[in-house]
């Protein structure tokens, strides 16, 4: 790594410690010894009186020096349960960082901060949130999540105990702020980051992590396949306030020089333990790719498009046997139960084109991973199920219905899905259409897609675009599902828009910077921020200004009709009309006399 790159990690940019808008502030929910993060958005007064602040979910975590990392929020909670122990852990070696590190003799930028001593469950103990929930215990993590979601703690415990929700919190990632994934809760989004053999660096990936969580990523997956895989992950985990996921087969493949058939259970198992000890919160495991399912993909247009799925399919064919992931699944469960690592059961046979959607291969694998979910639950290991992919809009909901049936209501986690294949460069949009639809139907978490999908490795700008697009899709689904409080944000924006409170509109935006920039392209002067029009219609044709003028000019006539004015006492107006209705005999219809006929 260059000196300039290292320096940028040591000296974070100003944006990292600033709010996304001056009207935003950190305003936690405080309950006992818990402090649960939220963002408060201050609003200007309306002509009719003050507006309450709007409070929204916050993922960015506290400020920190990235070379030091975050404070271990959950360390005391974990320690107080007295069911874990510290131990030496596996011995680190250069193969963990890949072939380039072995050639150099070192990783390019070693982690200099404190590295926690690995912990695991004591002999005979299980330390998963599902285990505690099944014992009737409401943990600090569950209390934290309940406050964050504005839900009852007992409801949170019940959903986890039933396998319908997960709190992915490895005991070796005490820096993480507990969050929950389940269809009864706010729809979550995941952002993928990670280097490749072609591009990126540790500095860039740490910056992407902090950037993604700044804009609202609920979890982040490190999908690094290039240099310094272990060290990059260490930097990411120690700086992450959100759960970190991985696909461990990628690192295992690097350890055998990229030759899939040389993979062994022993190498994979060692890689999994390495990542458990570092603090990875959930892992994608493609254990549902069975030998018998591979021929089902031969008539597809796009074959097997999952990297993990294709790796395991290649291994199965080379050895002509079931994958070691499937054969050793129970041992994986035992390992995960020691650290509270959640399964993200991978859809290695997901469709890579709308033509291949909902085919025999996809659904055969879904049935199998549904069976694996039940096996994981026997070990009290938390599970979510991965889904497609590329699916036409009319076929999306079938995926929700079959996942809930075959995977027994385990949380569903989907990549989009993309609903058309014709828009390279715009696949964040093609996928967000499907994402909103599938989330409305019950999917719990959405994996973002960036504009670079199918084209290249996303940079920081692409990460922001992907996160904002998917926050939009997730929120739209929450509004459609009637999630408590979801629409309050929309209503605050609508009121600010009608009253031409431009600064409030910017503050309430998912992306204030872009909203301000677009407004100021044509009306940059500060007085335009109080004008009752924008450049779309101008002052003469603004429909909202005209609507306000109508209300002002004909207020008395509107009052005669019994229609409360904006800002008026609507309840009092309705009560008065109710009294009038009763006084007239509570008749829906009354006779209208023709005065001319009786003259």
Swiss-Prot record:
Q: Name one GO biological process term.
A: thiamine diphosphate biosynthetic process
Instruction: Give the cofactor note.
Output: Binds 1 [4Fe-4S] cluster per subunit. The cluster is coordinated with 3 cysteines and an exchangeable S-adenosyl-L-methionine.
Top EC group: lyase
Q: Which cofactor does it need?
A: [4Fe-4S] cluster
Give the binding site residues for Zn(2+).
Answer: 390, 454
Instruction: Quote the InterPro entries the UniProt record gives.
Output: ThiC (IPR037509), ThiC-associated_dom (IPR025747), ThiC/Bza_core_dom (IPR038521), ThiC/BzaA/B (IPR002817)
Q: What segments bear the compositional bias annotation Polar residues?
A: 1-16
Sites where the protein binds substrate: 192, 221, 250, 286, 306-308, 347-350, 386, 413
Q: What are the UniProt keywords, alphabetically?
A: 4Fe-4S, Iron, Iron-sulfur, Lyase, Metal-binding, S-adenosyl-L-methionine, Thiamine biosynthesis, Zinc
Give the EC number(s) under which this enzyme is classified: 4.1.99.17
Detail which positions bind [4Fe-4S] cluster.
Answer: 534, 537, 542
The record's function comment reads: Catalyzes the synthesis of the hydroxymethylpyrimidine phosphate (HMP-P) moiety of thiamine from aminoimidazole ribotide (AIR) in a radical S-adenosyl-L-methionine (SAM)-dependent reaction.
Q: Which HAMAP family match?
A: ThiC (MF_00089)
Protein name as annotated: Phosphomethylpyrimidine synthase
């Amino acid at each position: 790594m260059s000196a300039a790159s290292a320096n940028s990690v040591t000296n974070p940019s100003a944006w990292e410690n600033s709010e996304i808008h001056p009207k935003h502030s950190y305003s936690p929910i405080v309950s006992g010894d818990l402090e649960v993060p939220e963002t408060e958005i201050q609003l200007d007064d309306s002509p009719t009186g003050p507006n309450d602040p709007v409070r929204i979910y916050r993922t960015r975590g506290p400020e920190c020096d990235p070379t030091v990392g975050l404070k271990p929020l959950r360390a005391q909670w974990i320690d107080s349960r007295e069911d874990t122990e510290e131990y030496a852990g596996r011995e680190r070696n250069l193969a963990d960082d890949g072939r380039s590190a072995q050639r150099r003799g070192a990783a390019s930028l070693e982690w200099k901060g404190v590295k926690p001593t690995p912990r695991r469950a004591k002999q005979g103990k299980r330390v998963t949130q599902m285990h505690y929930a099944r014992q009737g215990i409401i943990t600090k993590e569950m209390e934290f999540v309940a406050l964050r979601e504005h839900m009852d703690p007992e409801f949170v415990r019940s959903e986890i105990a039933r396998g319908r929700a997960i709190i992915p919190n490895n005991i070796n990632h005490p820096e993480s702020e507990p969050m929950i994934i389940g269809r009864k809760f706010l729809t979550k989004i995941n952002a993928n980051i990670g280097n490749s053999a072609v591009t990126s660096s540790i500095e860039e990936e740490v910056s992407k992590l902090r950037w993604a969580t700044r804009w609202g990523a609920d979890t982040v997956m490190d999908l690094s396949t290039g240099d310094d895989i272990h060290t990059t992950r260490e930097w990411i985990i120690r700086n992450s306030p959100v759960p970190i996921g991985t696909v461990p087969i990628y690192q295992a493949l690097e350890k055998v020089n990229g030759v899939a058939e040389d993979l062994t259970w022993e190498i994979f198992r060692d890689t999994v333990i390495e990542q458990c000890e570092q603090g990875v919160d959930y892992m994608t495991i493609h254990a549902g790719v069975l030998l018998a399912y591979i021929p089902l993909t031969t008539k597809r247009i796009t074959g097997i498009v999952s990297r993990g799925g294709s790796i395991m399919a290649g291994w199965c064919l080379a050895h002509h046997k079931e994958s070691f992931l499937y054969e050793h699944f129970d041992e994986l469960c035992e390992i995960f139960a020691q650290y509270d690592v959640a399964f993200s059961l991978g859809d290695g046979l997901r469709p890579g084109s709308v033509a291949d959607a909902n085919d025999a291969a996809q659904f055969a694998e879904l049935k199998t991973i549904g069976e694996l979910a039940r096996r994981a639950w026997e070990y009290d290991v938390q599970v979510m199920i991965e889904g497609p992919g590329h699916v036409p809009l009319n076929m999306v909901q079938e995926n929700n219905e079959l996942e809930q049936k075959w995977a027994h209501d385990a949380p569903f986690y989907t990549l989009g899905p993309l609903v058309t294949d014709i828009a390279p460069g715009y696949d964040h949009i093609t996928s967000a259409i499907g994402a909103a639809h599938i989330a409305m139907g019950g999917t719990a978490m959405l994996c973002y897609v960036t504009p670079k999908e199918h084209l290249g490795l996303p940079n920081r700008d692409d990460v922001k675009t992907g996160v904002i697009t998917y926050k939009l899709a997730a929120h739209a689904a929450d509004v459609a599902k009637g999630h408590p409080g979801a629409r309050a944000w929309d209503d605050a924006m609508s009121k600010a828009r009608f009253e031409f409170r431009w600064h409030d509109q910017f503050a309430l935006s998912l992306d204030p910077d872009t909203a301000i920039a677009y407004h100021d392209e044509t009306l940059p002067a500060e007085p335009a921020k109080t004008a009752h029009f924008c450049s779309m219609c101008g002052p003469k044709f603004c429909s909202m200004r005209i609507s306000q003028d109508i209300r002002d000019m004909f207020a008395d006539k509107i009052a005669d009709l019994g229609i409360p004015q904006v800002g008026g006492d609507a309840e009092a107006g309705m009560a008065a009309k109710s009294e009038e209705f009763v006084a007239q005999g509570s008749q829906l219809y009354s006779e209208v006399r023709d005065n001319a006929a009786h003259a």
